[in-house]
UniProtKB/Swiss-Prot annotation:
Disulfide bonds: none annotated. Belongs to the bacterial ribosomal protein bL25 family. CTC subfamily. It comes from Helicobacter pylori (strain J99 / ATCC 700824). GO terms for cellular component: cytosolic large ribosomal subunit. This is Large ribosomal subunit protein bL25. One of its GO terms (biological process) is translation.
Amino acid sequence: MLEGVIRESITKANAKALKKDGYLIANIYGKGVENVNCAFKLNPFIKYLKEKKHLIFPVKLGDKTFEVVVQEYQKNPVTNELIHVDLLAVTKGVKSKFKVPVKHQGTPVGLKNKGILMLSKKRISVECAPEHLPDHYLVDVAPLDVNESILVRDLEKHENVKILDHDSIAVIGVIKAK
């Protein structure tokens, strides 16, 4: 479980001091949850996120435990280092909006015909309760030839999950190489 510290002071000087000590500034918020300003050690946070198997993961702050999902993050444009992260605290049975990653499997037929695989949409916006949240959308790209694509409407439908993106948006496709 990922452990962090609650920030007592939310001043700019306090944030700079925490960043200097190797902390990542974070906010936890959600429906029915009071906003919490906190900080996590940067390297363990990144390592934990890369190894987690589900979108929802637990974090511990002092004696409180929250089930959260990464809602938004900010990176330094020059160094590409994480600066800040917003975590959405989820409550069982309460619908929220999430962004679910798209993963693909297989090798498209179109690659042999001088095509390039193009991932147009890396995340799909959905609305559901946390217990119905899919970990990812898996797309089989093997049958795709040049100038063919998979649209949002072609994705696997999950029960109790509403896809918020428009049906005609391309998720992944094979385009002709120039």
